[in-house]
Structure formats: structure tokens, C-alpha cells
């Protein structure tokens, strides 16, 4: 029974890091004040740019993350949805078909909806697949669903939404333009993520923390333990 409980618990922790595992990154920058994906603080985007001074760093991607109110287009009830904003030309997820979908976010007001989100968000997948125009409000502003992704709910999020940083900042204007919640770093082939993270943690100011992807996954799991 104890082993069954442990297995069940591990399964729950795994659902809390679904997005973390899908991120296309070797290193992840976060604010030292961030506690988990449900409690993220911002840090200066320029810290991410500064990592490019290191030869091992191949490319970076700034990401914003917060909870915004989604309006169910069927019953008009609102519910918090985890919203990620990134530059559509950057690589965000380890998903072959994702970049094609991300391309559609270059037009403002467009979003990708996680079809594994809880049903309380509305029949979004059904409407979208029947080629019905799926338009609703996020944070009181109109958005159009341009595609579906497959991420899945977690401890902290009943549903997920992906959009461009441009649209994100329009939906959440209180977010300073030069501030991000997550910085993704891809290293050149052959680089040692642990070694590079140690170098960056020593060289960057203490308003940012550099984790390997595995450490970022553990950071989230530890919050829920």
C-alpha cells in the first residue's frame, strides 16, 4: 500500500512539471523570489541577454508567465488560466509541430489553448475542430483561439494558454516591458549545463538565479512536497 501511495504521489508531482519538461532549454533563469509556477516574480530581461556573452550560450528566449481570467465563451463564467507569453520566432517547447502553430501568434490578440485544460473553460476543442470561430475574453480583452496545444492541467493550473509577448503585455499592461518571469537558455552542443549554470550564477547580479532544466523541475516539485 505504501508503495502504491508513493507511486501515486510521484505521479501527482509529475503532473506539476508537465510544462517544465516540455520547455526547450538547457538552463532556466528565474527570480530568486520566485517560489513556484503559481508564485513567480519578475527579473530584468537584460540578465538573459547578458548570458549571451558566454561562448557556451547558443540562444535565449524570454518568457512571461502569470494567471489571467479566461471567460468561458459558452456560459460566460470566468476562471484563472496560466498564461505564457513568448516571442513566436523563439523556440519554446520540445514539440515538432509547435513552431508552425506559434507562427499564428504573430498577429496580435491570438492565443493557443491547451486542449487538456479542465472542461470548465468551455468546449474550446470541440468548437475549434468544428471550424467554429472561437473568440472570447482574457483579462477583459478580446482574443481569438488560433490553435490547440497539448500540455495538461497541474497542481497549480486548471488550464494553460500560450500567446506572444506582444499580446501578453496587452492583456497584462501592469507587467513592465523589461521584466520576465522565465529566461530559457540553449547551450551549444557539448556544453556542460551544470558548469555553465555555476559560471553564470557567479557572474550575474543576485537579482537572478540560474538553474539547469532538471533543477528547475525539482524547484517546482519541492514546492508541492
Briefly describe each language-model feature range.
Residues 90-97, 115-165, 169-172, 195:
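Mid-to-C-terminal secondary-structure elements
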Residues 1-27:
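Alpha-helical transmembrane segments
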Residues 22-24, 46, 78-81, 106-108, ...:
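Extracytoplasmic
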Residues 33-38, 149-152, 185-192, 203, ...:
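Structural beta->alpha junctions
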Residues 193, 198-225:
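Peri-transmembrane interface segments
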Residues 37-42, 73, 77-80, 91-95, ...:
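Solvent-exposed, non-transmembrane alpha-helical starts
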Residues 30-49:
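Short extracytoplasmic
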Residues 45-54, 58, 62-112, 137-139, ...:
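The feature marks short, hydrophobic/small-residue-biased sequence motifs that occur predominantly
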Amino acid at each position: 500500500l505504501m508503495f502504491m501511495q508513493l507511486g501515486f504521489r510521484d505521479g501527482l508531482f509529475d503532473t506539476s512539471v508537465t510544462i517544465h519538461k516540455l520547455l526547450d532549454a538547457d538552463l532556466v533563469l528565474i527570480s530568486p523570489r520566485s517560489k513556484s509556477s503559481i508564485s513567480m516574480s519578475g527579473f530584468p530581461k537584460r540578465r538573459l541577454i547578458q548570458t549571451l556573452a558566454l561562448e557556451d550560450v547558443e540562444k535565449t528566449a524570454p518568457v512571461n508567465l502569470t494567471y489571467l481570467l479566461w471567460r468561458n465563451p459558452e456560459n460566460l463564467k470566468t476562471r484563472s488560466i496560466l498564461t505564457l507569453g513568448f516571442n513566436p520566432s523563439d523556440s519554446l517547447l520540445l514539440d515538432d509541430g509547435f513552431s508552425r502553430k506559434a507562427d499564428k501568434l504573430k498577429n496580435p490578440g491570438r492565443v493557443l489553448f491547451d486542449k487538456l485544460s479542465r472542461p470548465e473553460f468551455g468546449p474550446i476543442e470541440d468548437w475549434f475542430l468544428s471550424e467554429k470561430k472561437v473568440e472570447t475574453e482574457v483579462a477583459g480583452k478580446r482574443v481569438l483561439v488560433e490553435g490547440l496545444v497539448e500540455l495538461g492541467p497541474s497542481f497549480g493550473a486548471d488550464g494553460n494558454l500560450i500567446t506572444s509577448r506582444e499580446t501578453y503585455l496587452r492583456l497584462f499592461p501592469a507587467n513592465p516591458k523589461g521584466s520576465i518571469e522565465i529566461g530559457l537558455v540553449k547551450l551549444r552542443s557539448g556544453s556542460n549545463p551544470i558548469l555553465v549554470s555555476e559560471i553564470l550564477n557567479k557572474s550575474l547580479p543576485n537579482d537572478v538565479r540560474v538553474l539547469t532544466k532538471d533543477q528547475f523541475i525539482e524547484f517546482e516539485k519541492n514546492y508541492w512536497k
